[in-house]
């Protein structure tokens, strides 16, 4: 079932020229529920109440977010669509657009809201078109067509009745007004609509509520209470279906997070992707928790109504002492107990799902901490190798501008220059120094390895390099001044 809501239209729309062209989203495969795009304002689409077009999914209530997306004309007079961080996304020409980023649309582009379920096509599939107002006014949502408005509304209500009564068109409802009326749920999410009780369940309630002729009016109130219980049960079944979809999405998200954690080297892009996945997990957990709270509130309401009905029927039984009323009470109690058991079972299922998700998230955190510890261990080992193999024996620091002597020993260029001012022999083997060569390969290797060290070690090495450059510049200036004299 789907429903669309429009803001009140002004009179100038009725006085528009017959051939005025308008932009709209054409519903694929349907001649109704097209969404008009108003050029002078933003057009929001979602299942919430404060949107331009309200759409509700019949297969999964959480398929469409409260404010799913926004359509708007940009400065270049081009239509754009922006995904408002919806759970199931917006797909333009088969590709999902990034959240909070406007995507330019062209005429005949395909716009899909949500994802397909169980191999079925996407429920909300549209095409951007520009047509004459008179040609499409009967197809627009909100009954913009003047002549066909009442007939279209009547047909929609009849279709809703057929859908929720299991195709039994001959089954009468208590009043003419309630034949095809959609009752609002008492849950906090007011955007979901509740159907009338199904034909089979209403027939059962009617048979169970036939009292004696003189007590017919009092028995009718008990049948109405059972009908309310059936509505709660139908809503709970829809919550179960949406929970299965959420559970599948949580599993996919968790699997992706585990794959990212197994990789030792994490780039900033992967870190960001991991954070996005964790954000999605928290959002899904919030939705599961919200549905659990709604189910608990429904169960409490039903238990309260059950107690009130039980007290009322007990009073009537004591006053009238009629066999028919006693039978009605027993059947009503049986129906209430059945509904309460199903609610308790569903609540237990919600609790198990939340516990499983908490456990999976804890495992993910442990794996991430383990990977971090492994990385720190690698850095520690690298530091030990640098300190033991790539240190200058004169200054006990990592080589800075390493040079290799004729005896194959390596030192810092600054250190060996200072040493040769005193002795022209190798500090390690005491051979005469006949040549020294810069080792660029060794310098590059040390520089690349220093990048993975801690910030303190990198800062300390940078200070040493600057100090030695300053000393070299000072000595060169002294030498040049002495030569001029």
Swiss-Prot record:
User: What are the Basic and acidic residues biased-composition ranges?
Assistant: 199-219
Q: What is its main location?
A: nucleus
What's an example GO BP annotation here? double-strand break repair via nonhomologous end joining
Keyword terms of this UniProt record: Chromatin regulator, DNA damage, DNA repair, Metal-binding, Nucleus, Transferase, Ubl conjugation pathway, Zinc, Zinc-finger
* Stretch list, region Disordered: 150-232
How would you classify this enzyme at the top EC level? transferase
Zinc finger boundaries on the chain: RING-type: 392-430
User: Per its record, what are the GO molecular function terms?
Assistant: chromatin binding; histone binding; protein homodimerization activity; ubiquitin binding; ubiquitin protein ligase activity; zinc ion binding
Is Nucleus among this UniProt entry's keywords?
yes
One Pfam family linked to the record: FHA
Its name, as the record gives it, is E3 ubiquitin-protein ligase rnf8
């Amino acid at each position: 079932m789907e429903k669309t809501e429009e803001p009140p239209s002004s009179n100038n729309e009725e006085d528009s020229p017959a051939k005025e062209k308008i932009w709209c989203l054409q519903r694929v495969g349907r001649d109704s529920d097209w969404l008009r795009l108003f050029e002078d304002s933003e057009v929001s689409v979602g299942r919430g109440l404060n949107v331009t077009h309200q759409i509700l999914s019949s297969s999964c209530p959480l398929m469409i977010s409260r404010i799913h997306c926004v359509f708007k004309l940009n400065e270049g007079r081009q239509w754009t669509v922006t995904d408002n961080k919806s759970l199931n996304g917006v797909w333009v020409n088969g590709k999902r657009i990034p959240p909070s980023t406007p995507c330019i649309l062209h005429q005949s582009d395909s716009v899909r809201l949500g994802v397909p379920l169980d191999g079925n096509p996407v429920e909300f599939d549209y095409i951007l078109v520009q047509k004459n107002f008179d040609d499409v006014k009967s197809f627009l949502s909100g009954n913009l067509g003047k002549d066909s408005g009442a007939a279209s509304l009547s047909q929609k209500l009849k279709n809703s009745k057929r859908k929720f009564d299991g195709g039994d068109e001959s089954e009468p409802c208590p009043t003419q007004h309630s034949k095809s009326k959609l009752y609002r749920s008492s849950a906090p999410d007011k955007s979901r609509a509740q159907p009338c009780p199904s034909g089979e369940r209403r027939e059962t309630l009617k048979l169970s509520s036939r009292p004696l002729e003189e007590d017919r009016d009092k028995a009718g109130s008990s049948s109405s209470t059972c009908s309310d219980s059936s509505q709660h049960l139908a809503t709970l079944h829809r919550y179960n279906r949406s929970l299965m979809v959420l559970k599948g999405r949580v599993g996919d998200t968790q699997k992706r997070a585990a794959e990212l954690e197994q990789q030792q080297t994490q780039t900033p892009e992967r870190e960001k992707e991991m954070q996005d996945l964790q954000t999605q997990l928290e959002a899904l957990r919030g939705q599961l928790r919200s549905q659990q709270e709604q189910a608990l509130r429904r169960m409490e309401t039903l238990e309260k109504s059950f107690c009130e009905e039980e007290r009322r029927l007990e009073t009537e039984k004591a006053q009238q002492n009629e066999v028919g009323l006693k039978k009605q009470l027993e059947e009503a109690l049986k129906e209430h107990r059945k509904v309460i058991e199903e609610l308790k079972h569903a609540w237990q299922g919600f609790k198990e799902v939340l516990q499983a998700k908490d456990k999976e998230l804890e495992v993910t955190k442990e794996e991430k901490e383990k990977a971090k510890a492994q990385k720190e261990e690698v850095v520690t080992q690298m530091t030990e190798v640098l300190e033991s193999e790539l240190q200058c024996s004169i200054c006990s620091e990592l080589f800075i501008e390493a040079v290799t002597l004729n005896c194959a020993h390596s030192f810092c260029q600054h250190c060996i220059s200072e040493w040769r001012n005193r002795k022209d022999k190798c500090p390690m083997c005491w051979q005469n120094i006949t040549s020294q060569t810069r080792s660029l390969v060794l310098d590059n290797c040390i520089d690349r390895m220093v990048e993975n060290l801690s910030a303190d070690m990198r800062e300390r090495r940078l200070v040493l390099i600057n100090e030695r450059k300053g000393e070299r510049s000072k000595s060169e200036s002294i030498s040049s001044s002495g030569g001029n004299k």
